[in-house]
Amino acid sequence: MENRRETLLLQITGQLNHMTAAIPRGPKSAFRKVLLGTDNVRGLAELILDHTIKAISKGTGLTTAGEGLAIEMNKLTTFNLKSGTDRKVKYALISAGVEAFGSLKSLSYIDKVTERQGVMKLNKLDFISEDNLLFYYFEEQLTISELELPKEDYTYWTHPRKDGRTIVKKMPKSLTSQYTHTKMPRVYAALNAYGSTKFKVNEELLSVLMQMDEDKHMFIPKTIDSEEVSGALYSLMKFRRISEFVGEQAKKWYLANVSQQLMKKGLTTVQIDGRSKKYSKRKASGWFKEKTSEPLDLVRASSKRYEFDKVTFMARRMRNKTFHYDFQLDSRGRMYPVVNYFEPTGSDVAKGLLIFKNGVPVSDNVLYNLAIHTANCMGEDKLAMEDRVLFVWVHMDEILEAAENLTNSEWLNQFKSEKKTKFQLIAAVLEWKKYHEQGEDYVCHLPIGLDATNSGLQVLSAVTRDVIGAQETNVINHPDQEIGDAYMVIANSVLDNGFAYNNYEELDSKAWRKLCKRPTMSYYYDAGRECIQEQTYDDRRDHGVDVLSRMTFDDASYVGTAIYDGVESAFPRQTQAKEALKAGVEEALRNNGGKALVTWKTASGFTAFQDYSRIETGRVNCSFAGKLVQLSFQLFIDKPMKSDHSKGISANFVHSQDAALLSLTIANLAEKGVKSFMMIHDQFSVNAEETSLLLETFKETFIEIFEEDQLGDTLRAFGLQTNPVGYGDLDIQDVMEAKYIIS
């Protein structure tokens, strides 16, 4: 690989030197100015090679890939590509990046291709031939660029910029001063504590997965033929076009058959037309959902296989190494790793393949927490803690028997429906095997996770001081049962409202709980009725209930509407908070001078923002290997999309609060000496000896944040003088007694 890379770099460097020598006098393109302003042509060649591999492997559009390459090239030249208006900067970056990619076209390695996506066209890079040096190098890389792998060394965040990245993704220039270490020291502490965590690959699990893949085990995503995927994508585009016709016909039927009845009820022509459009949209959406179910399943299966291959290949590349992950923040303050796929917030496979470099020796506490983690992975996370431990020890003989032959274990196969944890379960089973083999010499490297109970509802219950919501999400102990269950509260709300349809009301409580889980979470992130209807249909096969798997879209629409109404009425204060946030952001926009950027502070010191701007389309002329190429791009204009602001504020506020909770929990744990973290927004993992410390610190941090009026402070920051939400009488100090706030 090194020989091929070096040969390619020599060729690209030679081509760039040739282009520099051939630059004429007079006006020059942005890329030619980059060449004249650099003394590191070799560095430019490396960027061009790595970004080409990255763009082709990800299927990135040419404008996006070109802009990304140019941003990196700008660091190696005295010519500033980022000088001028936003539109001029966009022109310069795209044209410079595209012309740079053209150097590989001149070497007969790549070309620009146009891919149709419905009515849209996407320009991308692809190989001219699969019989050339660049393609062979690409194959050796197996689509993983060196840019995408975890790093063996960690560089601390000390300023808002590091290694060419900003601490906040898409950081507005006007807010740069808000993200200094002085303004948010505990956020920096959290980022660096997480980033300095030492990870290694779970070698035992990786070997098991490779054997399972070879044996075509049911846990492993199947390989889908590329022609099948192409056919499925074509079908999706065809069905999308036909669905528009279905909607038009539905509207005609509605107006012909229903409009007279509505007119007799006193509705105006405008109101009737509005209803006909809504009916048309629902019919078109339902037809499209049902017709596209099979091709979508095929595309999703292909994506799962693609992800599995990426994760396992990256894990093989990192074998026998100690490595770190670098993190950036999003606009809410949530942490996201720079690396994709094989990373701590990724899929079940990725999480299972990651273990801490620094383990802890066996103790009663380690075994207790390993048992809880194992039970959680087995889907028994609603049992009391002691019962989870007992459950695992009762099944220990089966666990150890399965560990001897995981690829052929009937016991293990019963967990095939545990979409989120089956590979982490295998990792836990392997730990029990090691413990029983090694005894007192056993050292546990497995991250042990405690999950929040519906984090969004927890946050909204805390900020509105709602006792019922806090009990049902385990923010405080439940007075009548061991563990609160908000999803069953929603299910009972639906059934108590007189729901009766297709005998679904006869389903057991477990099925109803599954039906209500995702819609409940989505509702508090401001999902509307239509979204919840679609989720109900999309998830119909995931519940393990035959009658639900046979749902039509009309069935799902009826059930989804009932669930939406049930959620809305079950926790009224939380719904009030959503509406208050919408009123607040509307007030902020009225007083914002026509600007799109809206900000608020969180308890961590982070300045959260949402910036839903209007979009304009522009065109830029580029040179690609001497030929003129015209490309389209999108440019955000600093004028607000008010409807998007209104839709987004509930989710963004809640996520900003859980982000502050995560950051401060990590920072507080680091101060107490914890050195290994594996955190995922509302899932908190440390080593098996420190979960009790994690729980206590989490509760202390929760109180620290929510004893202040986070909702009221945010509404006042938006300019809303009166808080319309009627708070409950939750005593936030009761959180310290909570046993299951994370479990």
Question: Language-model segments: which ranges?
Answer:
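Non-catalytic nucleic-acid-binding interfaces of large nucleic-acid enzymes and RNP effectors
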Residues: 1-520, 524-652, 668, 672, ...
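Short, surface-exposed charged micro-motifs
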Residues: 326, 676, 683
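Short Gly/Ser/Thr- and Asp/Glu-enriched loop/turn motifs at secondary-structure junctions
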Residues: 331-332, 679-683
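Short cationic amphipathic helices and targeting signals
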Residues: 337, 682-686
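Short, contiguous acidic/charged loop-to-helix segments that flank catalytic cores in large enzymes
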Residues: 648-657, 685
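Active-site palm subdomain of RNA-directed nucleic acid polymerases
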Residues: 658-680
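Catalytic palm subdomain of template-directed nucleic-acid polymerases
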Residues: 685-700
